Amino acid sequence: MDLHKQWENTETNWHKEKMELLDQFDNERKEWESQWKIMQKKIEELCREVKLWRKININESAKIIDLYHEKTIPEKVIESSPNYPDLGQSEFIRTNHKDGLRKENKREQSLVSGGNQMCKEQKATKKSKVGFLDPLATDNQKECEAWPDLRTSEEDSKSCSGALSTALEELAKVSEELCSFQEEIRKRSNHRRMKSDSFLQEMPNVTNIPHGDPMINNDQCILPISLEKEKQKNRKNLSCTNVLQSNSTKKCGIDTIDLKRNETPPVPPPRSTSRNFPSSDSEQAYERWKERLDHNSWVPHEGRSKRNYNPHFPLRQQEMSMLYPNEGKTSKDGIIFSSLVPEVKIDSKPPSNEDVGLSMWSCDIGIGAKRSPSTSWFQKTCSTPSNPKYEMVIPDHPAKSHPDLHVSNDCSSSVAESSSPLRNFSCGFERTTRNEKLAAKTDEFNRTVFRTDRNCQAIQQNHSCSKSSEDLKPCDTSSTHTGSISQSNDVSGIWKTNAHMPVPMENVPDNPTKKSTTGLVRQMQGHLSPRSYRNMLHEHDWRPSNLSGRPRSADPRSNYGVVEKLLKTYETATESALQNSKCFQDNWTKCNSDVSGGATLSQHLEMLQMEQQFQQKTAVWGGQEVKQGIDPKKITEESMSVNASHGKGFSRPARPANRRLPSRWASRSPSAPPALRRTTHNYTISLRSEALMV
């Protein structure tokens, strides 16, 4: 009650103070208005006097000039000879002009002196703002009556004009003071409100700094990007022009794709704690691997691979022939790096190189890089170019990669990189900014929701390899075949069959069991998924299907929907991780088996051991579970619980809880678990697609 009374008292006091100030303001405003009217009257009187004196001065000067003309004309006519009347007239005009100039000079001098005297008088007689004009005007009137001469009248007119200017200046000062006084009263009356308003206005607008790297390492040259300046330049280019035009993309290629990625619709990425940067151990292992490879047969390909691995500029069709001589060739060490191999997708059309859109990315598996789990939504935000006839980006073959390029184009990017016609990489371990507070919050959320601190050890790798017909799971089940592949090529990995990139016959490695692969691009992607979600899914077997069967809380504050979305997102991400890691392992074993001379068996064994050690280390650091060649007979429900339904890259939005129909689960038999059924489903699809590919 005391607070209520105090509030009422302050309100009444404020109201009284406001009324008093308003009354004071009205009184002073009336006073200023009356003074302003007096000033206006004085100014009008001065203007009339100035006009009268100007007319008088003009008339008097005209009379004097006429009298002078009358006196000088007969004298000049007498002096001029009758034989030369023109000369006499010209001399008369000259003398007349000289006399006029002298008179004008005298008049100007008198005006200047009169102005100086008037300024001195004004300085001496300046008094109050209102009453200083009355004695000035009376003095001017007396002076005008007392001095009938031309010079005094001119001085008087000058003084009147000076008084007029000073009056105008004083009027401007008075109006300024009136305005400032009004503002002062307004501020005092609204003191409390102005305090709160100014406090709210002075609150800084928090701007989110884009999470990315401002420097791009492009062929060991650092190119700084100022997004602020380039946004205005490239906004029109992004909206109006085609992305695949040659000159515009070469000039502003890096900034254009950066802006394009920023201007895509803000589809929220899934919440993750996937900011697992490679530690110093992974870097040291990678450096040892790189030094080992530097002494082998990678060095001759350095210039060409560096040229082809310029990630920011599209390659013209004239350079396609330079790309393909090394296409399909394996190195002497039998190791193929999957550095920055883009996934190529086009529509179901004949191989005419039209409507080819390079829309996905691939990160290096050699260093501890991770692929963002938001593959599905990012694939939709990438734009498909319309005219690749003139210029198109050729996906670089993994056999051409050089270990130095992994350093110059660091693939440990914290965001998923687009390889649409201009590819952009945010790179560098030490320059990547990290939001520590956000990471801590997400870790706390994950510990609370998923209880990830119970099981933090990675599941051991399973190296048992089986047949290709049982192991292969295609990345795209709706793909159509455009060429022919042998079964030995099927073992070596998954081939994307919907990309029309013809490869010459003579560029295939001379292996009698292999055929020419037309229209195929190898897809090898590494993935180090976050530790917590993988183990959480294995420990609890949480899926959207299991979660939706549990009773939903009626509390509006429950985060049931958030958890369900997270589970759906990471289910799709972990399925792609399993496929990609298995694909890499199959490719690795096939490469080691298909080596054609040049390197000893001990070198291959050493490289294989280094690869296995490196994979084990990265699995411990990032919590990755790599399943390489798992037999479907040994798959249990726990091991396959992370597999999601194969289909589109996004999940259908969930219906409200009270309207879910039981027909969604009617097709399932109650005895068989859903994970095993999903496994067999994928198995049949892989057999069918393999039959298409062979």
Swiss-Prot record:
InterPro entries: SOGA1/2-like_CC (IPR027882). It comes from the Eukaryota. Residues 272-283, 476-490 have a biased composition (Polar residues). Residues 259-286, 461-490, 643-680 are annotated as: Disordered. Residues 663-677 have a biased composition (Low complexity). Residues 15-51 form a coiled coil. Keywords: Coiled coil. The keyword Magnesium does not apply. This is Uncharacterized protein KIAA0408. The lineage of its organism: Eukaryota, Metazoa, Chordata, Craniata, Vertebrata. The gene is KIAA0408.
